[in-house]
């Protein structure tokens, strides 16, 4: 049986594999089939690195199915409090994500969906960040103007550049203080937004 101990040493290689694919052509995020394929490819890759290539397909499918369940996720401690505070202040909140068609269900199962007025997933709409179209779709669905909006994300390339191209103020959540020179406003905790906005 594959354990976390078997896989953990190979996670940096899996992350590098994903980043290389994303930079080569991140359009896999524009369809449910494409996003599923990239996840399965990553899991098979880790299986081969961990020396279990003989059952890589079965393990990849099992991991992918588990990954879609809320119990396999843990939100940062500041998420719910920040979302609640923003809603109490009257902000319209939306999700813009390079994700598969299961995003809304996952957010529901994590009990986060009620905080959001819209969820825009790249696999559902056919556009991915940093394309400004996906940001504009979210603004349109929420009935807000781009120039009065703020996009909060963790990737300067997808989130910062995409929001800026759409005319939206960008804030990067940099929990590990690794993006000091990203060119966008930064916070190291989500609750820092409450002072920034």
Per-region residue spans from a language model:
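N-terminal helical cap/lid subdomain that shapes the substrate entry/recognition surface
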Residues: 1-77, 89
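Asp-based, Mg2+/Mn2+-dependent phosphohydrolase catalytic module
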Residues: 2-5, 53-59, 80-85, 91-197
């Amino acid at each position: 049986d594959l354990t976390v101990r078997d896989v953990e040493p190979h996670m940096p290689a899996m992350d590098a594999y994903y980043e290389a694919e994303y930079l080569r052509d991140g359009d896999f995020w524009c369809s449910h089939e494409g996003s599923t394929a990239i996840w399965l490819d990553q899991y098979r890759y880790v299986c081969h690195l961990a020396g279990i290539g003989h059952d890589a397909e079965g393990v990849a499918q099992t991991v992918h199915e588990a990954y879609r369940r809320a119990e396999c996720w843990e939100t940062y401690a500041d998420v719910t409090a920040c979302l609640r505070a923003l809603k109490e202040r009257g902000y319209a909140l939306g999700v813009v994500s390079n994700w598969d068609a299961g995003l809304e269900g996952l957010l529901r199962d994590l009990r986060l969906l009620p905080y959001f007025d819209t969820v825009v997933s790249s696999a559902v709409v056919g556009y991915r960040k940093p394309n400004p179209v996906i940001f504009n779709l979210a603004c349109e669905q929420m009935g807000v103007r781009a120039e009065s909006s703020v996009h909060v994300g963790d990737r300067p390339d997808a989130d910062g550049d995409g929001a800026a191209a759409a005319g939206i103020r960008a804030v990067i959540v940099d929990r590990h203080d690794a993006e000091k020179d990203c060119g966008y406003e930064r916070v190291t905790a989500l609750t820092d937004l409450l002072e920034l906005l």
